[in-house]
Amino acid sequence: MEFNSEVKKATNSIYKKISDIMPEIEWSTHAPYIYEINKLKKEKNAVLLAHNYQTPEIYHGISDFSADSLALAVEAAKTKADIIVMCGVHFMAETAKLMSPNKKVLLPDMLAGCSLSSSITGEDVRNLKKKYPGVPVVSYVNTSADVKAETDVCCTSANAVKIVDSLGVKKVIFLPDDYLAKYVATQTDVEIISWKGTCEVHEQFNDREINEIRKNNPGIKVIAHPECPPDVINASDFTGSTSGMIKYVKENQPEKVMMVTECSMSDNVQVDNPKVKFIKPCNLCPHMKRITLPKILDCLKNETNEILMSKETIEKARKSVERMTEIGR
């Protein structure tokens, strides 16, 4: 595809926004796709939803709405578009389908999975419910529709503590992220029965890395995602969901900050906070990085990679997500 004068003119305002983090030679390879995608989505009445971990050319270049998992689910439920293209991973596209079952939901790469989602099955949940009869199941939204169908209420990292406390019980089964479960347990009096799932990005971080960053950057603020190991949480100044981390930077405007999460998010937040210096520990999510501009254009143009589920699964799984969105943040 050609980076001609028409493409350059149409995408120039976008590039101005992200030029500090992307050289023009790289932009010239992205701009033709951005131009075509933005034109095509209007023709097809499509909406592009992007998770905070998407790369800047997607996050700032083509997405109509960029957010964390909770906000993406809410947006999917209320969109007036005919087609939803989920620039994220498979469970996010499934969740969009649950919230808008009559919409066509597309995922640019069907192999964009998640280590948390793949760590547990619906059968695993049924076995846990037999082992702990009567104990409500809270599942992280990073799970398959089959798991959500066996779940009482879903949660995200933004509202996990609120969800658990809202149930008014002494004990819950919390799935599948063991580190998030440990974090929630420190914030509530409810007993947490956890599962041994982990995020392959966040589990790589450790407190030694943080201490070294602090040593080389006096005064830096370290903010971590609750999917990180406990030693990382304890070594950080703030712990929060991706939306919480974005809010922290926006409101506090620290001189320097280290965001202990997926690397692309720091790039995206840096664009909107140019006065803040970001020290970036670059752990990338290989699943999120399967989503690229060429794949987005192809799936939108040909309407391929549609998310399909049985009516029974949608009806069962949707209840747990709707309950989550009703409780909110």
Describe each region flagged by the PLM.
Residues 2-259, 263-329:
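Active-site loop-to-helix "anion-binding N-cap" substructures in soluble metabolic enzymes
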